[in-house]
Design a protein with these regions (language model features):
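Bacterial N-terminal signal peptides that target proteins for export
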Residues: 1-8
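Bacterial N-terminal signal peptides
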Residues: 9-18
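Lipid interaction determinants
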Residues: 22-92, 104-166
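Extracellular/luminal ectodomains and secreted, surface-exposed scaffolds of diverse proteins
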Residues: 93-100
Length: 166
């Protein structure tokens, strides 16, 4: 019995110290929703259409351009005009947000306005960049064919100070 116990203990130790790396699969770093808290404000720095990242089309998509604030502790967000700092809350620019468990989808639930949810694909999220994509009508004009836009944000360090309404 003592021999069997010694053999089993030895096999367990060999297994622990010689663990096969073939079982480990490398994964892409996952976005961390807490990275939204790394900057008090985020500024839209670029908008581009899928397949054309070199062409900035911010001027065609003013509804997605501005300063945003995110509170991951309360899951609250709010958008502001980049030129004035005025809130877009009354126009549906504030409410709750969530990131799905797989860290791939970013969902907004505005407090007010006709839109009930906005589903966005989370492309990149770290302390230096927050990028999402979603399908919208080209140039945000109803009836135009859908395109996937990518909206890139970086931490805002300008003079405009904003605060969440709720």
């Amino acid at each position: 019995m003592k021999t069997l116990s010694s053999v089993l203990t030895g096999l367990c130790l060999i297994g622990l110290f010689n663990a096969s790396e073939s079982y480990a699969t490398p994964t892409e770093p996952q976005p961390d929703v807490q990275a939204l808290a790394s900057s008090p404000q985020w500024l839209t720095t670029k908008v581009y259409i899928e397949g054309a990242p070199q062409v900035d089309v911010k001027a065609n998509y003013p509804g997605v351009v501005g300063i945003s604030m995110w509170d991951p502790q309360r899951n609250r967000y709010e958008f502001f005009h980049a030129d004035t700092g005025l809130s877009k809350y009354a126009d549906g620019g504030g409410g709750y947000f969530l990131v799905t468990g797989d860290q791939n989808t970013h969902i907004l639930v505005p407090d007010v306005g006709p839109v009930k949810t906005v589903v966005r694909r989370l492309e990149k999220l770290d302390k230096n960049e927050f990028t999402y994509s979603r399908e919208v009508p080209r140039d945000m004009v109803a009836g135009n064919p859908p395109v996937r836009i990518y909206v890139v944000h970086t931490p805002y360090i300008g003079p405009i100070k904003t605060a969440l309404s709720n």
